[in-house]
Amino acid sequence: FEISVPNRADLPKGKKVLMGMIPRSSDELILCVDSDFDFLFADRTEQSREVNNARYMFHTYAYATENFLCYAPSLHNVCVKATKNDTRIFDFVRFMHEYSCTIYPLFLWYAYSAQLSSENVFPLIDFKSAVRIGYLDLADNGEKTLEWLRRNVAKREEMLRKRNPKMIEPMKEFEEQLRGRGLTPENAYLFMHGHTLMDNVVMILLNSVCEKLRAMSIAKITASKKQGVALKNEMANYTNSLRSIRDVLLDNENYTKCPLYKRLQRDIEKYIARTIWNMKRSGA
């Protein structure tokens, strides 16, 4: 089925609007939002308390839906759909594991800064510039790119520690709380700002890998025994079959094995089961 959104400029948008609707939420008004940091923060902020205790609000657990789209085990299939080439030339799972572990210290600083209502220790714009990857060197599964990132992260972390020495100890307790909510160095990318992950990390990877895969496919066609019109037709058929990488990523549905998605799925299943039970009990 398809849900059509009314095309009206005066409709209120955003999470703040939905937060204001929590008191009115019910079986007739179910709210669905990106978690942002609210799941991780548990009861550290007023908004996180509201989100985590709202009976009729479902949230992503991951920072946003973009993080699901960028689930590492699903990215190879994005390349296959975009290039029509299923050759595995890059291990996305291994790279994202290393990437996530690398940016983990800065993620903690950014998250800690975000939950402070009066201080702006490490704002989003600085986090973005520190964890983005400007390029991907495919050799050795991106190791040179990761080395470049590690140097940048180390410099930024050292600067933050020097500027904010009194925050180092409180951050240790903060980290323990976040780990209690399921955060690990390996899955930190699922909890980071979603558009930063998609636009400044994953799209860089996909563009580089897909460019190589397309070049491989074209080289294979060119090296075939076909000539003249037959060769032109095969080349045209291939290029016409290609899809926009971003469009394929936005259509990605292969994140259903992600543990955070499964948790959301269980929440919905429990709600449906509870609703059916209540309807039967009331004779509806």
Protein language model features and the residues they cover:
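Acidic, divalent-metal-binding catalytic cores of TOPRIM
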Residues: 1-284
